Swiss-Prot record:
Keyword Ribonucleoprotein found: yes
Classification via Gene3D superfamilies: Ribosomal protein S8
Entry-linked Pfam families: Ribosomal_S21 (PF01165)
UniProt keyword list: Ribonucleoprotein, Ribosomal protein
PANTHER family membership: MITOCHONDRIAL 28S RIBOSOMAL PROTEIN S21 (PTHR21109), SMALL RIBOSOMAL SUBUNIT PROTEIN BS21M (PTHR21109:SF0)
GO CC list: ribonucleoprotein complex; ribosome
Region described as Disordered: 52-76
Ribonucleoprotein as UniProt keyword: yes
One annotated GO molecular function: structural constituent of ribosome
The protein's name in its UniProt record: Small ribosomal subunit protein bS21C
InterPro entries recorded: Ribosomal_bS21, Ribosomal_bS21_sf
GO BP, one annotated term: translation
Family to which this protein belongs: Belongs to the bacterial ribosomal protein bS21 family.
Gene it is expressed from: rpsU3
Length: 76
């Protein structure tokens, strides 16, 4: 992965690199590969993640249809 450093602004280039890595899922992949995960544990984790995604989608759809109240935004 490449990031262009403009005007010797390394901080900005580092922020852009981190954002790209985050979007690609590199940090998550590194965390998952730190230690061996048994196949049964991996399957259970993936199933739980899928259920969470489905619940989130259902909750968002219910909010769009007006069946659930939307979360109030916190004003600063």
């Amino acid at each position: 992965m490449q990031v262009l450093v403009r005007d010797n602004n390394v901080d900005q280039a580092l922020r852009i690199l981190k954002k790209k890595l985050q979007r690609e899922g590199v940090f998550r992949e590194m965390r998952l590969r730190e230690a061996f995960e048994k196949p049964s544990i991996k399957k259970a984790r993936e199933k739980a993640e899928a259920i969470g995604r489905q619940r989130k989608l259902a909750r968002k759809q219910m909010q769009r249809e007006g069946l659930l109240p939307t979360k109030p935004r916190k004003d600063k």
